From Swiss-Prot:
Broad class of enzyme this protein falls into: hydrolase
UniProt record similarity statement: Belongs to the peptidase M20A family.
Residues that, per the record, bind Zn(2+) 2: D105, E140, H378
Residues the entry annotates as binding Zn(2+) 1: H72, D105, E165
Name the UniProt record assigns to this protein: Probable succinyl-diaminopimelate desuccinylase
PROSITE patterns: ARGE_DAPE_CPG2_1, ARGE_DAPE_CPG2_2
Top-level lineage group: Bacteria
CC cofactor note: Binds 2 Zn(2+) or Co(2+) ions per subunit.
Cofactor: Zn(2+); Co(2+)
Keyword Metal-binding included in the entry's annotation: yes
Span of the signal peptide: none
EC numbers for this chain: 3.5.1.18
PANTHER family in alphabetical order: ACETYLORNITHINE DEACETYLASE, PEPTIDASE M20 DIMERISATION DOMAIN-CONTAINING PROTEIN
Length: 407
């Protein structure tokens, strides 16, 4: 029994794909969802991050246990729209696929949760407890929306949390963190014909980088025991088992220097240069450790000429891989997905769970699970399989009922 027809479910997704939320303007989706919830007498509230960015929270039921369902409303930039086969901000159905920016990451998952909430309420299927939907702004960059909801206490009383990021047949119980670490070197600019009276910032930065590589390489030699196991994820993505050595490396700390800047013209000694790193912290080497690791190298080289800035700082999140939420989703999904395709793993990427749960001292059940092939995220001609989108609505409904009934 459903409240919405298949055609209506696809149209609801089409409606929010048309709302252009490229790293901004989530307020438009909030207003759309508020009207939709009002139509079905579901209480909801819009919480603004700023004028154009906002979250919306909606809730059905009452009392405990409390299951939170979450998805983000922002999408990444569509890039040059001329490179798309179909318009990115218009849902196009072709050969069983629904094309459009955000269909996979993650308006498909978000709308599946919205429909889940409405249909459970309309069909009076909630056995006990509360379902709280949290639609967030700004996940793709700084997680501003999730931070706001956490600060306001919307996660303080939850027993379980489903984040409907595109995971295909994967169910994730934990993930690494993500840090942006920028190291800036300062010097003295002079004409390049007299470099000896200046101070080349690039030289100082290179000294830092050489020390960083040496110490990071030494650290990785001892990074062999991990709480997070990402091997099942990689087996699914590449279609075969990865070596124990690769699994060890992938499950541990990773740090990549991804941006370098220095100098403005060839005949001047640069007075500033910078390196930016993306670091993926793990429980064994957490965010505090990473900050100290960078700062210690800066102190060794020259703290008067080098500085550290951390504009993005998301912690790794862990939960019980055998929690009631994980086992419930796995059992329900097995009726819709081939049993041998379903796997439970830790995730190398970060989600709003970092801001929602932090180090998860309260042991909230966490499941990152949603429709869409994760490899389609951020791609030109992004799409979600229509059947997957529709099936996952049913999975979310059944799993929510079972979890609240048995928790």
């Amino acid at each position: 029994m459903t409240t919405f027809s298949e055609k209506e479910k696809i149209q609801l997704l089409a409606d929010i794909v048309e709302l252009q939320t490229e790293n901004n303007n989530e307020i438009d989706v909030c207003n759309y969802l508020k009207d939709l919830f009002d139509k079905y007498d579901i209480k909801s509230e819009i919480l603004k991050v700023n004028e154009h960015r906002a979250n919306i929270v909606a809730e059905i039921g009452n009392g405990s246990p409390i299951l939170a369902l979450s998805g983000h409303m922002d999408v990444v930039d569509a890039g040059n729209q001329d490179n798309w086969t179909y318009p990115p901000f218009q849902l196009t159905e072709k050969a069983g696929k629904l094309y459009g920016r955000g269909t996979t990451d993650m308006k498909g998952g978000l709308m599946a949760l919205v429909i889940t909430l409405i249909e459970l309420k309309e069909q009076n299927q909630l056995p006990q407890g509360t379902i709280r939907l949290l639609a967030t702004a700004g996940e793709e960059k700084e997680q501003e929306g999730a931070k706001l909801l956490a600060d306001k206490g919307y996660l303080d009383d939850v027993d379980g949390l489903i984040i409907a990021e595109p995971t295909g047949s994967g169910i994730y119980y934990a993930h690494k963190g993500s840090m942006s670490c920028k190291v800036t070197a300062t010097g003295k600019a002079v004409h390049s014909s007299v470099p000896f009276i200046g101070d080349n910032a690039i030289d100082t930065l290179l000294e830092f980088y050489n020390q960083f590589k040496e110490k990071y390489s030494e650290l990785k030699k001892h990074d062999t025991k991990h709480e997070l196991d990402v091997a099942p994820m990689f087996k699914s993505l590449i279609g075969k088992e990865i070596s124990e050595e690769d699994a060890n490396y992938a499950s541990g700390l990773t740090a990549v220097c991804s941006i370098i800047n220095g100098g403005k013209q060839f005949n001047s000694v640069p007075d500033e240069a910078s390196l930016e790193f993306n670091v993926r912290p793990v429980p064994e080497y957490d965010n505090d450790f990473i900050e100290s690791f960078f700062q210690n190298i800066i102190n060794d080289v020259d703290s008067n000429k080098l500085s550290l800035d951390i504009p993005s700082n998301h912690r790794p999140v862990t939960s019980d891989k055998n929690s009631k939420l994980i086992t419930t989703i796995k059992d329900v999904a097995s009726s819709y997905v081939e049993q041998d395709e379903i796997f439970v793993s830790a995730l190398v990427g970060a989600t709003d769970a970092s801001s929602f749960l932090g180090d998860n001292k309260d042991n909230v059940d966490l499941a990152i699970f949603g429709p869409g092939n994760p490899l389609m995220a951020h791609q030109i001609d992004e799409y979600i399989e229509k059947d997957m989108y529709l099936k996952y609505i049913d999975i979310f409904k059944e799993a929510s009922i079972q979890y609240l009934k048995e928790k």
